[in-house]
Amino acid sequence: IFSLVGLGDPQVRAATPVNWSKMLAYAGMMAGRSRSPEVVSGIIGHCFDLDDVGIEQWVLRRVEIPKDQQTRLGQANAALGEDTLVGSGIRDRSGKFILRIRNLDRQRFADFLPNGDDHDRLVKLVEFVTREQLAYDLELQMRPRDVKPMQLGADVRLGWNSFVTPEKARKLPAVRLQIRR
């Protein structure tokens, strides 16, 4: 039955710490070629028991153009109106999204940070579900009531789970992590 969602090989399932059994509920949606933001956020919410998961599409990013592909007179990539680009990079909105997980208590917030218990599982699941290896950021938002003032000796990681001005942070206590460029 795992073959329906592309997980027929037991070695593939064993190689990652994702609870693949929860994926069976999405077998029909996973059989298709593309994944809508609603499907991706729904799967992530279901697999991690999260209530507030969303995706922002069409996020602006800058893509560097390798030197050998940059436009040069008398070289390839210099046909006006076809493949000419000026500069060493381009602005792109088709290859990046933001995965937002909101309303997390302090512990769940910590679980999704790079050194947290669920970070690697989440990254593997997103890679599997999206299929196309798009660039994305992970934005984690802590519940405002869980934002604590910075205090030495406490569970404090400046820039991750503590804020110099917690009053301002309570308005939008979010951390954005660049997962894939």
Give, region by region, the residue ranges found by the protein language model.
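Feature for intrinsically disordered/low-complexity regulatory segments and propeptides
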Residues: 1-72
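C-terminal structured domains
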Residues: 42, 46-181
